[in-house]
Structure formats: structure tokens, C-alpha cells
A protein has these predicted regions:
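C-terminal ends and interior cores of transmembrane alpha-helices
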Residues: 76-91
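C-terminal membrane-cytosol helix-exit motif in multi-pass small-molecule transporters
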Residues: 150, 169-179
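Glycine-rich segments within core transmembrane alpha-helices of 12-TM secondary carriers
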Residues: 129-149
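Helix-loop junctions at membrane interfaces in 12-TM secondary transporters
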Residues: 3, 87-99
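Cytoplasmic helix-loop-helix junction between adjacent transmembrane helices
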Residues: 98-136
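Helix-loop boundary and gating motifs at the non-cytosolic
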Residues: 1-52
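Helix-to-loop junctions at the C-terminal end of transmembrane segments
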Residues: 54-67, 153
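Residue-level signature of mid-helix packing/kink "hotspots" within the transmembrane helices
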Residues: 48-56, 142-143
Length: 179
């Protein structure tokens, strides 16, 4: 298997770990930040809107310029989103938190392209194995993400749940080195 496919698998694992962190804590944070519990899922909705809005444009951008540029933009979007989410948590502001999750959604939408990048990196005979390897990064992330969210939840005692988004920022920084 080409070395780049392994790097793509690690990068997808990082992005998916970030998604698992968000899924683990977003609604709980939304409930704490909203005046009305009815709005507690708005941040998660915002993330999915970001994902949906990013998927097709990022695919075109990667096709026209390069996959690397798209993945770098995805990482930066994730970092911006995680930082805005932290600001929302610190200032008890549902709007900032929701906008932050919109940007993490863009990052997750970008991550959908890793499997296609694996196809470009692997010889035709190894396409199925390459996609399988890259997608297996999501299995590791399903375990690591929620665990990391719990472990970092009280990282900043004054601001519960700022820790997971600090970890998320670091994850997106690390992901920059894997494509």
C-alpha cells in the first residue's frame, strides 16, 4: 500500500475524532447555552448545514486546484470552528458556538474527500484496500473521540466543555501534517 494512503487514513481518523468529540458534547453544551432547551440542538444542526454546504464546493475546488489545498482549508476551517466554539462556551453565547460548529461542519465535509484521494494514490488493483484502510480510520475515531471528550471535559475548570474544543483545535493542527 502506498505510504500516502496510510497518511490519508491517519488524517481521516483525526477529522473523524473531531466529529466524534463534537457529537459527544454539542447538545449538552447547546442546552447549557440556550435560554430555551428547544434550541439545544441548533449547534449540531449548524454543523450539519456546514457539512452539506461544503461537500460539493470543496470537491470542485480540489478538482480544479489540488486535494492538498482542500484538506488544508478543511483543517483551517476546523481550527476556526473549534476556536469560535470555545469563545461561545466562555461567553455563554449560543450564536458563537453554533457558528463555530458550522465551521467544524465544513471541516468534516472536507474529510469526505479522503477516500477519493486514496483512490488517486493507490494502484487500481489496490483501490478497494486503499478505501477500506482510509475508512478504517473512522473506527478508531469512534472510540478515541468520545473518550477524549470525557477526558478533556474539565480541562478548564472555570469553563466546562472548553477542553474538548481545545483538543479539537489541536487535532486540526496535527491533521495539517498528514497530507
Amino acid at each position: 500500500m502506498p505510504k500516502n494512503v496510510w497518511w490519508l487514513a491517519i488524517a481521516l481518523a483525526l477529522f473523524t475524532t473531531g466529529n466524534a468529540i463534537v457529537l459527544s458534547v454539542a447538545v449538552v453544551i447547546g442546552e447549557k447555552l440556550s435560554v430555551d432547551p428547544t434550541y439545544s440542538t441548533v449547534p449540531l444542526l449548524s454543523q450539519y448545514i456546514g457539512l452539506i454546504m461544503a461537500t460539493i464546493p470543496i470537491a470542485y475546488l480540489m478538482q480544479k486546484y489540488s486535494r492538498k489545498l482542500g484538506f488544508i482549508l478543511g483543517s483551517f476551517s476546523g481550527m476556526i470552528g473549534a476556536i469560535l466554539s470555545i469563545v461561545g462556551i466562555i461567553y455563554y453565547n449560543l450564536t458563537y458556538f453554533s457558528i463555530g460548529l458550522f465551521f467544524t461542519g465544513i471541516a468534516i465535509g472536507t474529510a469526505q474527500q479522503f477516500r477519493f484521494a486514496a483512490l488517486e494514490e493507490a494502484p487500481k488493483a489496490l483501490h478497494a484496500k486503499a478505501v477500506g484502510l482510509v475508512m478504517s480510520g473512522g473506527i478508531a475515531a469512534a472510540l478515541i473521540g468520545p473518550t477524549l471528550a470525557v477526558m478533556t471535559q474539565r480541562f478548564f475548570t472555570e469553563y466546562p466543555f472548553a477542553g474538548p474544543f481545545s483538543a479539537l483545535t489541536l487535532i486540526y493542527v496535527i491533521a495539517l501534517f498528514y497530507y
